[in-house]
Amino acid sequence: MLSPKRTKFRKPHRGRLRGIATRGNTLIFGDYGLQALEPIWLTSRQIEATRRTITRQVKRVGRLWIRVFPDKSISAKPPETRMGAGKGAPEYWVAVIKPGHILFEINGVSQDLRYLAFKNASYKLPIKTKFISR
């Protein structure tokens, strides 16, 4: 699963998911992509599950680009722990996604196959997505 090798700070603030994506909202590498329509914290597990689904569908044909990276750590306290005593340890990693952000790009795959791959991939994501082309 994806996670950064090192970060400047171990435990970032939560922040808020307001507005639409101003960066990462256009196709750069491939001719077709999967675009997020809702804001979310996308976990590294969800990104990996989606990647596996797409690669299983297209097999060795074409090229896939992952346009998101989980660079924000989410901390959590152990269960049945009393409040206080500082912030919990980093539990997992997320990518902050705003509406309009391109999640995956693909190229060199037939129309039927890429539609099927992105359709099956969208079931692995907890948000609404849109299939876009150049």
Curated annotation (Swiss-Prot):
It is found in: Plastid, Chloroplast. Part of the 50S ribosomal subunit. GO terms for biological process: mitochondrial translation. It comes from Guillardia theta (Cryptophyte). Gene3D superfamilies: Ribosomal protein L10e/L16. It comes from the Eukaryota. This is Large ribosomal subunit protein uL16c. GO terms for molecular function: rRNA binding; structural constituent of ribosome. The keyword Ribonucleoprotein applies. It holds the Pfam family Ribosomal_L16. The lineage of its organism: Eukaryota, Cryptophyceae, Pyrenomonadales, Geminigeraceae, Guillardia. InterPro entries: Ribosomal_uL16, Ribosomal_uL16_bact-type, Ribosomal_uL16_CS, Ribosomal_uL16_dom, Ribosomal_uL16_sf.
